[in-house]
């Protein structure tokens, strides 16, 4: 296999689209001939302090380029973060303050180096060239596109026809992202499929500014733990890189068997041919251990697996439950009793009494390994006795009545 073929095989693994494939091959040939690494960028707006597994689809593709000897640029969009990416939005996003954006950005460098080699990664902030830009410069930049062109975007087009407001500054977002490619002289830009319009804007602006246009590579969007929506903090379906090992393992074990295969494909280099014949539970545990090990170390991955097997697979009550609670007479009714609904609610492991009631009715409560399905039932508490509660599939509590 030639070096060109080897590089293409790794670069194209898991991608959705390359614009244009011939240009990518041409750039790689020139790179090999001149011994000049390609400049490959991917941008991330620090709208929240946590990076999650959804972000790592792009970061791992950056890693592929890095392994091939190219210069990867992790661009922190501290300037674009203050605009707010309108992609997929049905209304204008609330702009973040500069202080909040910078606060979030501080955690990004620490997190990305769980994957990328810090010695071979260029970290940039787009405020470096955007903040000094004058009003004249912004006018010049905005002259490179038109309102008609912006309305070709699906989200803008939909909002316009639904007579929902579109703020002028939102039109600036694709232009600023595109100008990032000009400022960095990027050869390749990576992004999710939902970023295609913005990525193509980079190609257009590079042409306008006399540069060779970048190749655009789009990557699939990773579904969150619900298996439906794109992984995001706002959707509550994300797995953060800085989740604890046990929390990360538990979230990964909660995904569907079908989504498990998707995670194997997008988040690992494992051969799917070897995964599909395996028992789903075993394959899922292997996936969870693999991902936990990547971000917390091999030992943490194995410990999380053992803890999960003890807590869920073997149905043993864990040595360290989620909550340990001591009730007093003031917490009980007359006769030293308490309703199951109140008992579950007092653990704090459900958000409300109504949720506790729903959980009990659906058979999601066990007291001392006995399933409870009557939401009107009461429990007689014996002073000094410790009651073991399993609440839902993954939460455990120890409750003791002090007797006073």
State each model region's role.
Residues 205-404:
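Conserved nucleotide- and phosphate/pyrophosphate-binding catalytic cores
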Residues 63-110, 115-116:
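Well-ordered mid-protein domain cores that form the structural environment of catalytic cofactors
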């Amino acid at each position: 296999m030639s070096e060109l073929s080897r590089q293409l095989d790794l670069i194209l693994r898991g991608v959705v689209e390359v614009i244009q494939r011939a240009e990518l091959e041409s750039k790689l040939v020139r790179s090999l001939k001149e011994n000049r690494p390609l400049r490959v960028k991917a941008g991330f707006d620090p709208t929240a302090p946590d990076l999650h597994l959804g972000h790592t689809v792009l970061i791992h593709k950056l890693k592929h380029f890095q392994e091939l000897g190219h210069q990867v640029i992790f661009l922190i969009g501290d300037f674009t973060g203050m605009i707010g990416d309108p992609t997929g939005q049905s209304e204008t996003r609330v702009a973040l303050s500069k202080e909040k954006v910078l606060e979030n950005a501080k955690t990004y460098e620490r997190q990305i180096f769980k994957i990328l080699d810090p010695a071979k990664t260029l970290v940039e902030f787009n405020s470096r060239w955007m903040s000094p830009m004058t009003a004249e410069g912004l006018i010049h930049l905005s002259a490179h596109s038109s309102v008609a062109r912006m309305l070709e975007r699906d989200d803008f087009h939909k909002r316009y026809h639904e007579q929902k407001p579109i703020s002028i500054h939102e039109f600036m977002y694709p232009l600023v992202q595109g100008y990032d490619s000009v400022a960095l002289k990027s050869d390749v830009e990576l992004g999710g499929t939902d970023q295609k319009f913005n990525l193509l804007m980079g190609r257009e602006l590079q042409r306008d500014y006399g540069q060779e246009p970048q190749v655009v590579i789009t990557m699939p969007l990773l579904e969150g733990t619900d298996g439906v929506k794109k992984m995001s903090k706002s959707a509550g379906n994300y797995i953060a890189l800085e989740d604890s090992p046990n929390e990360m393992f538990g979230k990964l074990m909660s995904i569907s068997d079908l989504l498990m295969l998707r995670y194997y494909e997008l988040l690992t280099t494992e051969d799917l041919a070897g995964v599909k014949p395996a028992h789903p539970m075993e394959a899922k545990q292997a996936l969870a251990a693999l991902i936990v090990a990547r971000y917390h170390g091999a030992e943490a991955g194995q410990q999380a697996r053992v803890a999960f097997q003890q807590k869920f697979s073997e149905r043993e009550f864990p040595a360290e439950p989620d909550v340990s609670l001591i009730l007093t007479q003031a917490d009980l009714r007359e006769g030293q009793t308490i309703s199951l609904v109140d008992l579950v609610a007092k653990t704090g492991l459900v958000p409300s009494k109504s949720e506790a009631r729903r959980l009990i009715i659906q058979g999601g409560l066990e007291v001392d390994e006995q399933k409870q399905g009557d939401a009107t039932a009461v429990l007689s508490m014996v002073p000094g006795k410790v009651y073991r509660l399993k609440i839902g599939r993954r939460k455990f509590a120890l409750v003791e009545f002090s007797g006073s």
